[in-house]
Each structure stands twice: as structure tokens, then as C-alpha cells.
Curated annotation (Swiss-Prot):
Residues 3-60 form the DEK-C domain. Residues 66-93 are annotated as: Disordered. This is RNA polymerase II transcriptional coactivator KELP. Pfam families: DEK_C (PF08766), PC4 (PF02229). GO terms for biological process: positive regulation of transcription initiation by RNA polymerase II. The gene is KELP. Belongs to the transcriptional coactivator PC4 family. Gene3D superfamilies: Homeodomain-like, Transcriptional Coactivator Pc4, Chain A.
């Protein structure tokens, strides 16, 4: 499939999805409407796969937007929590502290072997210094993006788990 054709299909599919009721529209309906608008048969296997990828990308972006909006609303409701403060705070190693989750846990951005990592870790005090423990996780940019993209699914799973208890 030519680049120009792909761009036309992608633009049309996104336009259709943007104007549609997401509770009613299906991938088949999107493909059918795009076929009619573009006068191209999109029932071919490669076209179906491409339309599916555009739909999935659109839905992922929508979920991410909804999640971000819900987080912004939560932050506004929560008021003065440590996360999201305008003041930048750094630890003893010079790592940026994004958020203190509790007295012993925090989220930081740190450099390790030339890579930036998002670190969610537990800390302990020794000789007046706060030092990281091995309890925690450090994520690369790519891993963080994947984690963030899947946050709505993780939240839903946690809600289901909590409702069973």
C-alpha cells in the first residue's frame, strides 16, 4: 500500500472515529464508511489490518486522554498533595524527586549508565541521609510509556480486585 493511500485512509478513519458514538461504532462500520468516502475497497486483508491498527491507536490515545483528564481532576480535587507540586526537590544524589508517596517511598527521575529512569522506590535513613533500598522498580522511558498507556487497564483490574474483597 502506498504512503499516500495510507495517509488518506488514516485521516478518514480518524475523522470517522472522532465524529462517531464510540458505544455504537464497530471496526467493520468504520471500515465500511471509510470505503464509501474514499471509494476504495478496504475489505482486503492488508487494508483490514491497517484500519485495525489506526482504530487501536485512536482508542489508546483516547484512553490516555481520559486517564490524564481524570488525573488532572483528581489533582485539582486533592489540592495540596506532594505529587505535582511546582517546587522542584532533589535528593542527596541530585535526582529529581517527582513525588513522595509516603515517608519512606518516593518517585524520582534518576540517571543510570547514561539513561534516564523513573524510579519508584523505598528509602531508609542512615546517618541523616535517605538512601534507596532494593525494594522498588526503575523503568526506562519506553517501559514507563507502556506502563502509563496501560494504566486504565491496571486501574480496572485493581477495582475488580478490591470489589471482591
Amino acid at each position: 500500500m502506498e504512503k499516500e493511500t495510507k495517509e488518506k485512509i488514516e485521516k478518514t478513519v480518524i475523522e470517522i472515529l472522532s465524529e462517531s458514538d464510540m458505544k455504537e461504532i464497530t471496526e467493520f462500520k468504520v471500515r465500511k464508511l471509510a470505503s464509501e468516502k474514499l471509494a476504495i475497497d478496504l475489505s482486503e486483508k492488508s487494508h483490514k489490518a491497517f484500519v485495525r491498527s489506526v482504530v487501536e491507536k485512536f482508542l489508546d490515545e483516547e484512553r490516555a486522554r481520559e486517564y490524564e483528564n481524570s488525573q488532572v481532576n483528581k489533582e485539582e480535587e486533592d489540592g495540596d498533595k506532594d505529587c505535582g507540586k511546582g517546587n522542584k526537590e532533589f535528593d542527596d544524589d541530585g535526582d529529581l524527586i517527582i513525588c513522595r508517596l509516603s515517608d519512606k517511598r518516593r518517585v524520582t527521575i534518576q540517571e543510570f549508565k547514561g539513561k534516564s529512569l523513573v524510579s519508584i522506590r523505598e528509602y531508609y535513613k542512615k546517618d541523616g541521609k535517605e538512601l534507596p533500598t532494593s525494594k522498588g522498580i526503575s523503568l526506562t522511558d519506553e517501559q514507563w510509556s507502556t506502563f502509563k498507556k496501560n494504566m486504565p487497564a491496571i486501574e480496572n483490574a485493581v477495582k475488580k480486585m478490591e470489589s471482591r474483597v
